[in-house]
Amino acid sequence: MRKIVMILAAAAQFAWASAQVAPADRRMTKMGLTAAQLAHYMAPGVNLGNTMEACDWNDIFTNNAGLKSETSWQNDKTTESYIQSLKKQGFNSLRIPTSWVAGHIVDKEKMTIDPAWMLRIKEIVDYGLNAGLCVIINEHWDGGWMEHDAFTNLANVSEHKEMYRKLWVNIAKQFKDYDQRLLFAALNEPGVGGASPQAKGEMLAPDSKEFADRLLEYEQVFLDAVRSTGGKNAKRVLIMQGPKTEIDLAEKDTYDIARLKDSAKNRLMAEVHFYDPYIFTLMDKDADWGKVALYWKGHAPADDQGRTVNTISYNNKNVDAYQHITNLVMKMKKKFVDKGYPVVIGEYGANRKDAFLYGGNQKLHDESMMAWYSSVTAEMLKACLIPYVWDINVQPLPHMTLFNRAKEVVSDSYIFKGVMDGAEIGMETYHKIYPKP
């Protein structure tokens, strides 16, 4: 009986997801939509994680990685049928984290990208657009040459600007004829990740005005580079990352996206990421200051061994776990959405674990995972943020994986159902703010 109920529930879920997919229309394949209008079509989104961004920092400014890097962090080459399956499962957009500099540069002076690599990126972008998805490509961590090295106290800022400009001119030229369903994101997590072998100096404090000012300078370079290539890039929607893509840092007055000067009107979005709270989402070993959390509020055993997130300490106060999520996402609504800048949650997720390794209850841990994903997805959408769940195609636990790409099926029903349940809860409010244009 329980199996039948689960099957029926899954069928109902799929029916909801399919109903939310708006058919493509002529306006979508042009360039007339503002960022806010385009946002209507984008949620929910999913990442092609650990794939086209896979790299080795020792390969910076070389062409040593080649096409084989696509499967260096996970096993499967991306297929068009897999991307089509994402649309069928209820997703409306795809984020493709991308490396360009660490292993795919044939001429450092001109920042020329390996033609074979560019062709492969374009092929996957085409998979997404042909499937009816909006698509984001970015300059990801890429060995740290920008996200770390460009933000140190001894960085040659003018040199980084020029190299970054050349890189984005070369990328943008290749996509200048692509319609508005393709979006560019400047970076990934500026200020996060290790230094490249060429780094000099120490990282600026990410919460400082100096860091925010430098980030905005680089984002202006990105914006100007893309616009300079003309064609459809003149009006393409571009996505800007807050410091470290952390909500609290992006909220600070020091990071002011309105300072960016754009020749196109209302074509900018902001981006942050969400892996909160750390003890539940990313922590994998107990520490003297706390334990790995296995359970989310309302889903714990009687003896949880101190592994439940009921409240979260924030600014010296204990905040209800669910309220904490709401508080964080509403910061982004107030800072950006209410001022006309849609917000992309470029990544969010929590590692589902083998609870037995911690002496825990697997069933209640799995329920907790589903509850977290549902709550986070719903609250993001109700705050009119565009969520992109992180997915890496790693099957053994721990993982942040929804799908088995080789088989093109859902491989983690707990995470997937959590995301789709949350989307069902949040999309009505989301579409009130972002109605169909």
Stretches with model-predicted labels:
Residues T79, L328-V329, W372-Y373:
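Amphipathic coiled-coil/heptad-repeat helices and related helical stalk/stem segments
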Residues A355-P437:
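Aromatic-rich peripheral "rim/lid" segments of glycoside hydrolase catalytic domains that contact
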Residues S158-A321, M330-N351, K382-L385:
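Active-site region of glycoside hydrolase catalytic domains
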Residues D25-L33, A39-V237, G242, D248-A250, ...:
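Active-site mouth of glycoside hydrolases
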Residues G49-T78, D107-I113, N156, I279-Y322, ...:
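Acidic/histidine-rich helix-loop elements
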Residues M1-Q20:
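Bacterial Sec-dependent N-terminal signal peptides
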